[in-house]
Amino acid sequence: MEVIPNINSRRAGLIARIKLIVRGDLTTGNYDPVLAESFSGCIPTRSAFQFSGADGVESAFPVEYVMRMMNDWAKGECNPYIKIQNTGVSVLIEGFFDPPINATKAPLCTDKVNVLLNTTESTGIVLSDINKIKQSIGVDCRPFQACLIVNCFVRLPIVQLAFRFVGPSDPGRTTKLLDSAIAAYDAKIRQRRKRNLQIMESKSQDHTSDGCIPIPIIDETHRSGITGESKSLFGMFKNIASGECVTTIRIPRYIVMLWIFSVLLAMVTWGSYRLYS
């Protein structure tokens, strides 16, 4: 049976995915074991991984791409930081999920994209600063349009760093892929809303089947269709119920006397019948 990967399985093996995009002339150093597993809610507080390059190495490190992978693995609960240091014998690249105390940052701007590191000196870049840098130097901030990389030229005792924004090799194809991803996301949202609406309708039908029948409400259109006679009849019942309507019946006096005499005659006749029987 084929197992469909979920979001947790896609986030697993972060260190392996980072190794796939880092060039082979950079040696993998120590890394936190949790990077080989799915995110468990615990973010490493110290150096998460290390890469190093010996004297004479000329290599490019995808700074922004790696930090965005780290942010995705941690479900956005971090602000990744990449530290680059000249150790005196090599260049050391370290990844942190949050900037450490007194973390140095590269002063990147339009006129300055190169940094020279002497022995024991270091610099770095934070993910949250990348969009600010893009805006300041006029780089396209849309996803997949420009990605920050750093070229390391190790010439001990000096390490030269050159920060560059590189775009896709085929901008048209990248734009189409981005548009299709946005369309797929919108379709997923619409499907989720439709499913929630169906669930709500089924719940309302269940309440109706249990005996909870909604009371119909007469709108103004139906109310206007009531005739004048019906309105007067309703008004009379309303007045009677509220005690506002008092009816007086006038009966002639002779009819009253005749009715009393008939009652007395019936009583005398019934008494005589009982006495002689």
Curated annotation (Swiss-Prot):
Keywords for this protein: Host membrane, Host nucleus, Late protein, Membrane, Phosphoprotein, Transmembrane, Transmembrane helix
Keyword Transmembrane among UniProt keywords: yes
Localization in the cell: Host nucleus inner membrane
Positions of transmembrane segments: 251-271
One GO CC term on file: membrane
Bilayer topology term: Single-pass membrane protein
UniProt superkingdom: Viruses
Family according to the record: Belongs to the herpesviridae NEC2 protein family.
Subunit and partners: Forms a heterohexameric complex with NEC1.
Protein name: Nuclear egress protein 2
Native species: Gallid herpesvirus 2 (strain Chicken/Md5/ATCC VR-987)
Gene for this chain: NEC2
